[in-house]
Amino acid sequence: MAGNDSNLIWLDLEMTGLEPVEDVILEIAIIITDSELNILAQGPIFAISQTDDVLDNMNPWCIEHHGKSGLTQRCRDSEVSLAHATKESLAFVQEWVPQGKSPMCGNSIGQDRRFINKYMPDFEDHFHYRNLDVSTIKELAKRWKPEVLESVVKTGAHLALDDIKESIAELKVYRELFFKL
């Protein structure tokens, strides 16, 4: 096992909704950064194959946004199973970070973790139990220093890789303007 104990694993999922009991994963993307938030590697991006029934019965928000982004069609066309995405995602992070060292990093990452825990438990086992959740800092900035939020740029693409890059950039803004580091 290679990797650095201080590297961070960033990920984002797109799902058919917000409830892991009834919804499923549509897309996963991963980025590895060092502790200073410099991107070291972009991992695999998988659109998970889903049936028409699953895609046609997403909640209205997902039907609209995943339709606009092209993700729905990518899932219809995909031949990638969740098992394959899990195996390849785990292999990728194992190259960069030893098991149990990186928190799960991202925006509202607790939500993603619920889905990973249910659908990708072998992958979830690679992470430290802690989360690095950028949305927590956003909530603090909103209350304690709202002017910082003006410097955060969001495109709202709702594609996993774009969302990760935005989360990393957002944390850099908070580091500079909120924490003043």
From Swiss-Prot:
Enzyme type, top EC level: hydrolase
GO biological processes: DNA metabolic process
A GO CC annotation given for this chain: cytoplasm
Alphabetized SMART domains for the sequence: EXOIII
Active-site residues, record numbering mapped to chain: 129
Listed EC numbers: 3.1.15.-
Keywords: Cytoplasm, Exonuclease, Hydrolase, Nuclease
GO molecular function, one term: nucleic acid binding
Positions of the Exonuclease domain: 8-171
Localization (cell): Cytoplasm
Superkingdom of the organism of origin: Bacteria
InterPro entries, per the entry: Exonuclease_RNaseT/DNA_pol3, Oligoribonuclease, RNaseH-like_sf, RNaseH_sf
Main location: cytoplasm
Function of the protein: 3'-to-5' exoribonuclease specific for small oligoribonucleotides.
Sequence similarity: Belongs to the oligoribonuclease family.
Protein name: Oligoribonuclease
UniProt source species: Colwellia psychrerythraea (strain 34H / ATCC BAA-681) (Vibrio psychroerythus)
